[in-house]
Amino acid sequence: MSIRFIYGRAGSGKSLFCINQIKKLIDSDKEKKIILLVPEQYTFTTENKVLNYIGERAFLNTHVLSFRTMCQKVFEECGGRVKQIIKDTGKHMLINKVLNEKIDDLSYFKKMSREQGFNNIISELITEFKKYNINIDALRDLTDKIDDNELVEKIRELSLIYEEFNVKMHSSYIDTDDELTLLAKKLLANNIYANSEIWIDEFTTFTPQQLEIIRILSKASVVNITLCMDKIENSDVEDITNVFSSIENTENRLLKLMEENNIGYLNPINLNSKLPYRFKNSEELSHIEKYCITYPFKSYKGKNKDVRLYKANNTYDEIEKVAKDIIRLVRDRNYRFRDISVVCRNIENYNKIISVIFNDYEIPFFMDQKIKLLNNPLIVLITSAFEVVLKNWSYESVFKYLKSGLTGFNIYDIDRLENFVLEHGIKSYKWNEEEIEKLKNIKIENGATEDELTIFNLMEEVRNSLISFHKLIEGKHYVRDICKALYEFLLSIKAFERIDEWIIKFEELKLEDKVKEYKQVESIVIDMLDQAVEVMGSDVVDTFEFFKILNSGFENEEIGVIPVALDQVNVGDIARIKGREVKALYIVGINDGILPAAHKDEGILSDRDRIELKEFGIVLAADGRSKAFEEQFVVYTALTIASEYLMLSYPMADFEGKSLRPSIIISRIKKILPNLVEESSLYDLSKRSDHFNKVISPIPTFNELIFALRRELEDEDIDEEYWGEVYNWFKENEDFKWKIENTFKGLRYSNTGEKVSRNKLLSLYKNDLGKLSFSVSRLEKYAECPFSYFIQYGLKAKNRKVYEFTPPDLGSFVHDILDSFTNKVKKEKIAWSDLDMIKCKNIVSELIDTKLKEDSGSILNSTNKYKYFSKRFKRVISKSVSVISEQMRRGEFEVFNNEFSFGSYNDGEAIVLELPSNEKVYLNGRIDRIDTLDLEGSTYLRIVDYKTGNKHFDLNQFYYGLQMQLLVYLDALIKNSEYILKKQALPGAVLYFKVDDPIIKTKGDITTEELEKEVLSNLKMNGLILKDAKVVKAMDRGIETDGYSLVIPAALKKDGDFKAGSEVVTEEQFTLLREYVNKKMIDLCEDMLCGDIKIQPTKDSDGSHCEFCDFSSICQFDSSIEDNKYKIIMKKSKDEIWNNIRDELNDDKKEN
């Protein structure tokens, strides 16, 4: 018999020609058997075409098949597989088995073979070998011919794996990749298609397996093959840069097959001689088809009406524009949704946003994409049940298991359990029965609540359900036993029953996609376990090995879906759009590197390897360079699929705001269609032509109405006059009536804290003794944001407790150790000058060890991680105290006291603030260290506050009430110095000291002395110092000789005056600061009690308080709302701050 080629470029009517010829054959010979062979993904649409053009009678003797369905049909009629077919999951398991057995024979792939996903790579390569008829002998013969040692090693080991795989496979099973080989044998033995008419359409290329089927069919039948090409002339020279190169290559291979097998060559049909059928109604689209890949090209001179180009701000803007345009086509131009398709090259980046927006716009659509099973709750349940044992009962694995929704525990109990587990750090061995019982007894001794006892019972239920399963799978077991244990575990927790219940709910909600997914997932899991038993049942593996095999199978499982309705917009990948009748096409995401797609992953066999193998007659799939030019054909197909209307779009930024560049396709189209206007949100042609362009479907129209109302409230001009009628429509509509009312409330909504009565606030803030007792840090928090303060200290809101070592915990720990260190030095009468690094290290180590021993339940004793932290803290604190000792050694100040508390009635009385409203506020606090100096009959005070973070004194922050602590402490000590020191004191300095072990960066070698100086400089105290050279020199003797200090922020000129940059203030200025801080505290307290709970976070050049606030979800501060404004901390000069302080104090004195 013979083969005939049907040539035609895109849109020339090749598929229609085939169907018309089939119709003529049916009319002339009703008994003639006809086969229409198309790619698998096009069978459904092709059957619809045949049904529409010919009618039901076509299917009496005409069969629309793919190569796979041809296998099934032939095997049904002639008998076929005598062995069980192995699925992809079983194939991966078999490959895993081969790799484990042959691991010692591998060198190149030995390490690689243990990596996750390697099985998939080998599976794909074996499939490729079979599709291209590459046998083991052909691979082995190469090892003596190739000079590339690395490639020889790859081929040798691949041959070994390939051979062993085939031996194990063919002993009991048949691979889906072998089906076409078996089909060829059946067709040769059973001439079932003799005298048939075969039509092959929509193929770009054929694998050697498929070519063999075509060869056999053409021996007994007439075979017609469509080729998407623009010429009939044959060329022996392959030009891969030609967009039709892959088709031409297919043609050459078919001609060679015909020549070698003496197959007749019928006169070809050329459909390129007339105007393309598809574009009979659109000159623009016809012009694009003709010149989008042609060099040189001609520009289209006509008026543009069928092509649009849209530059979107982002993907949301892009898809919303597409949705609006689809509605326009359906509403104004009488399109059906089924006439429209939306395609892109990266559907996984668009599927969610398309689903959301199309549902809002009430556009029915079919997402032509397979569903990945890895995130299905049943799969999550199974993988997490294994992860619990493999990850030793980690928090993540336990709650991943519980939150799968299939364990039988209700979400309220799971949430309570999660809070309890986080609070007590329950993970790993703490899930042991003994540890839980120990914690339970401690709770009972301390008066456990009923809620806590319920949680312990819940923990026991969780443990029991998993422990019984883990006992059956831990260690090494036969695969069949692990599969049985897993299946029985799923039955015991009634997972399948809950899946069935969900399916019923999905059916009630008409969620067809979910129904299909959940109906299939159960059978997929059981099939996978069956495959595991069939393939590896007698193999002994450990839990991790089995989990790897199982997880690999789940990663590759996908569920195919078919359209549930006829009138839907088709959404999918560009590569799957062929074969459809599309009147209007939207191509989205036309960005550089995305369309055309960039092929980077070469796999085990690189492009170079494939080219070298091709030289020795081993032809495999296309290399990266060829794929790049094949991608041009994909682009050509996409641009030419629409018959009436084409809209191209690209976003300028992705979801993260990262800028994107337009594809080269955009510039090409602009040149071909010079009259094409690039639209955007700023220049939208539809707004000019459609006065009602914002009135679309109810939800988006409702959103536009809200924007219009918002603009009106803000006194902006509104061009549209129809919003009043739109508002009335929504007001009368039952579905939107309540929404419109709530929205109006929202538009008038003022996000401000409600006024709270003074009495209520007093009752909230007073302590158990009925006093208003605050710390200075609390007042600073109020200055940062009044509302945040009210939530934390008024309503007593707290974060979920988590068993972790937080920065505040570190601060308390460091303060305790430094306090103990100072007390030990004082008690044992050790002079600071006698402390060196070794002594400091020994004392600190002893203090920390003692503290951790006394507090056996400390988190620092819990895990190796925290034990390492405690060692690190020893190093940091040792370095810090050695620096403190050096600072004390360099000066004349002496430590008077440390951890001095006022307001606790142990060291000193509270600071009392008398408010204008006659309430008294008692301030309490703790001073880390008080140093004193007796000089020339006067006593000077130095306040030192230890900080574990980067805290620097900022006069600007002090002015706004955000850094008051040091000055409050200084004022309290000076006012009470007669009582505390037994003599009047003067201000010397207020300083922060950072507790740290700094890393010193150097350029080359450094001496020990230089290193010590660098450390001192890095840990130099910062704050304010009295502008008195004698006092400053008493803090650091070295300043006199060096001119600068390594201890304090001060430097002296040669004449004894202070250099610029020295943080010094006069005694009078210290007095001003003390007076101002008292005034500021009174103002803040009075403001706090007035009842106006302002949502007013502070903001400066470094950011806003909201960035670190735990309560931002409560206040919902939004700077776009008129009433929500930041309290801006303006950066003022020092002179301006001093002038403001003086002015405010003077004004205050005048008022009083």
Swiss-Prot record:
Pfam families: ADDB_N (PF21445), PDDEXK_1 (PF12705). Binds 1 [4Fe-4S] cluster. Residues 276-579 form the UvrD-like helicase C-terminal domain. It comes from the Bacteria. Residues 1-338 form the UvrD-like helicase ATP-binding domain. Despite having conserved helicase domains, this subunit does not have helicase activity. This is ATP-dependent helicase/deoxyribonuclease subunit B. Keywords: 4Fe-4S, ATP-binding, DNA damage, DNA repair, DNA-binding, Exonuclease, Helicase, Hydrolase, Iron, Iron-sulfur, Metal-binding, Nuclease, Nucleotide-binding. [4Fe-4S] cluster binds at C785, C1106, C1109, C1115.
